[in-house]
C-alpha cells in the first residue's frame, strides 16, 4: 500500500492537472453522490490535501471530496476525451477542458461539507500528517511521551495512523534503522538523545522520501537520493555496521532490521 510520500505525490499530480480549472463534467458512480454532480459543474479544485492515506479535494463552494484508496483505489490523470483501457471500475470523474482525473476501484468516497471535516470518523481519528510542514519534532516528541502512546511498542505504534498519519511499513523499518532501535522499544524507555533522534527521523525520512523519490517499487532499489537501507534487503550487508540484515514479522507485517546495530 502506498505510504504518505506516495499519496502526497499523487495529490501533486492531481493538482498539476486540474487545479484552478473550471470543471466541465463531473461523474460519480455511487448513487448518494449523484446529487453533487451538477453542484460541481463550473467549480474548480482549489487544492488537494492529504491526511495520511486519505485525499481531500477542496472546491470553492465549500464542498470537499473525501477519498481513501485503501488497497485497490488509484487515481489517474488523462487528456480529456481519452478513455483508458482498464479492467478497473471507475468511481469518480472530474473533467476540465484539457485534463481529466479519474478515480478507480476505491470504495471509501464521500462528499463533505465544512462542518463534517471535523466530525468525519477517519479524519477525527487520524493523527498529524508527517508531511505537514507545520508539524515539528517538538510536537512529535510530545506525542511520543503522551499517556496515549508512551507505553506502545514502536513495531505497532509506527503503523498506527492515530499516532502520525502517513507512516507505513517501509517508513517504519527505515526510521527505526536510522535511529538504531528495534521495534520492541517504547518511548517511555528512551533516553533524551534517543527520543530526540526518533522525533526528528519520524519527520525527516518521510519528507526526504517525498522530495527525492517516486512510487514505491518494493522489488527494486532506486537511484534517487532516497533509497532503502534495510527494507527488502534481508540477507544483504548493512551499510552502517556490515552486519547481515534480517527479516521477521512484527505487528503482522514484514520487518527488516540489522541485529548488528539496532538494539
Swiss-Prot record:
Keyword Lyase applies: yes
Binding, DNA: 70, 125, 169
EC assignment: 3.2.2.-, 4.2.99.18
UniProt-listed SMART domains: Fapy_DNA_glyco (SM00898), H2TH (SM01232)
Free-text cofactor note: Binds 1 zinc ion per subunit.
ZnF (FPG-type) residues: 229-263
Signal peptide: none
Cross-referenced Gene3D superfamilies: 1.10.8.50, MutM-like, N-terminal
Catalytic residues, chain numbering: 2 (schiff-base intermediate with dna), 3 (proton donor), 53 (proton donor), 253 (proton donor)
Described purpose of this protein according to its UniProt entry: Involved in base excision repair of DNA damaged by oxidation or by mutagenic agents. Acts as a DNA glycosylase that recognizes and removes damaged bases. Has a preference for oxidized pyrimidines, such as thymine glycol, 5,6-dihydrouracil and 5,6-dihydrothymine. Has AP (apurinic/apyrimidinic) lyase activity and introduces nicks in the DNA strand. Cleaves the DNA backbone by beta-delta elimination to generate a single-strand break at the site of the removed base with both 3'- and 5'-phosphates.
Family statement: Belongs to the FPG family.
Protein name per Swiss-Prot or TrEMBL: Endonuclease 8
Annotated source species: Shigella flexneri
